[in-house]
Amino acid sequence: MNGTLADQLQSHLANYGQPMVNSQRNEDPSMYMNGSAASVSHTNGSSSMGNDQKFPSYKRMAQRRKVPEGELCAVCSDLATGYHYGVASCNGCKTFFRRTIVSEQTFICQYNGNCDVNKNIRCACRHCRFNKCLLVGMDAKALQIPAIQNDRDRIGPTKKIKMSSGSDDEQATTPHRLQDQEIIDQLTQVEGLCQELRRCIIPEVTGVTHALTSPCLLFETTDLKVDVSLTNTIFKELFPASMNDIRMWNIREMRICIEWAKTFDVYQRLNLFDQFALVRNFAFAFNLLNRVFYSPDHGPDKIVFQNGAFIMRQPQQQVQLSGCRPIYTRQMDEIMIPFRKLQLSVAEFATFKAALFFNPDALDLSPQAKQEVFEERNKYLGGLFTCITQKIGIPTGVQKYGSLLMMTASIQNILAQNEENMQVMELFKNWEVDPFVKELCMKRA
């Protein structure tokens, strides 16, 4: 696995600076200012209008003005990176707004048109996110439409790619970046759907095969009942976790893992045997990664589940089992704390998980599936590299990318230790492992 990751990094560094010629399009951005619906329509206009008219001077000043330290994005409340299109906003919302305008997309809300838009679930409903962009004052007239840029390039030399910049508006668009961004957007949207499913009552299944062959629940969350014990957890007092809390979250996360896996087209094309092999290899990693990433930050010595239950660095007596080696300290030191130091975004986290999931070395994966899984992993590694570097630039981005990939060894070691603990539980019967978890996580003899 490590060789594959290193090769992919070298490949993306080599291919990074090849610009794609932008198609010439004559558009009037003022057509995009109707805030009553999250839709974009196309009309022909004149590309000869001066840049000062298309991009008023006060907007240019706003774009250059630095945001105060700690300023939040007006759209999703993530940390703002600057004034984009007239509004203090993060790179994610800036890119989303620009892409929506330029690609003429139309979105439909599946609910009542009043979805919550915040940094954790901002990709769940693009209709409401685009409306929020307009509501807070993002100005489509501030976009420099590609046709204007092409006219400018014909007059003067083509601008060089700014390799040190993290802004995709300042870098030339390349084919692999466009493809990577589509991958990132899709994964981030699915991540939001997983968060919705975590708050729902998940139907029971008879086993892993039943779960794999059932329709994907991520697209049916509106039909599921909300689990009231998991709502508004941010306002609840924390309480020490019991073994029942841990058991409940293990089962829930592994059920969500299967629903998450079923959103990948390549995964759906695999036969059932290979599907089983991939999820068995990754299910507990999915559980572990989500546990620490979504744990509210109550310091480096505490993992907090989303229902308010917590585990300390020195686990409380009720979650200690005879003969089992504690793994929570390693989860904190080797995964949770590094994630926080890297300031991992939801998009980066979602793409990292996808790259880990498609493991061509997964036990019992058929030779026929290995090549397809290998290519799929490379696709998500490329998406991860783009996701990181477009935000913070190549030099810093390479370090962050490498730091993430180096964590895979720790993740594998923790998984091996968990497997050992499950074998001890099974041998000494000091805790009954849930049948679904056992089928999904314990390697066959």
UniProtKB/Swiss-Prot annotation:
A zinc finger (NR C4-type) spans 73-93, 109-133. This is Nuclear hormone receptor family member nhr-1. Residues 70-145 bind DNA. The lineage of its organism: Eukaryota, Metazoa, Ecdysozoa, Nematoda, Chromadorea. GO terms for molecular function: nuclear receptor activity; RNA polymerase II cis-regulatory region sequence-specific DNA binding; zinc ion binding. Belongs to the nuclear hormone receptor family. Orphan nuclear receptor which acts in concert with the insulin/IGF-1-like signaling (IIS) pathway during osmotic stress, perhaps in response to a ligand modified by the sulfotransferase ssu-1. Keywords: DNA-binding, Metal-binding, Nucleus, Receptor, Transcription, Transcription regulation, Zinc, Zinc-finger. Pfam families: Hormone_recep, zf-C4. GO terms for cellular component: nucleus. Its main location: nucleus. InterPro entries: HNF4-like_DBD, NHR-like_dom_sf, Nucl_hrmn_rcpt_lig-bd, Nuclear_hormone_rcpt_NR2, Nuclear_hrmn_rcpt, Znf_hrmn_rcpt, Znf_NHR/GATA. Residues 179-444 form the NR LBD domain. GO terms for biological process: cell differentiation; regulation of response to osmotic stress; regulation of transcription by RNA polymerase II. It is found in: Nucleus. Residues 19-55 are annotated as: Disordered. Residues 36-51 have a biased composition (Polar residues). It comes from the Eukaryota.
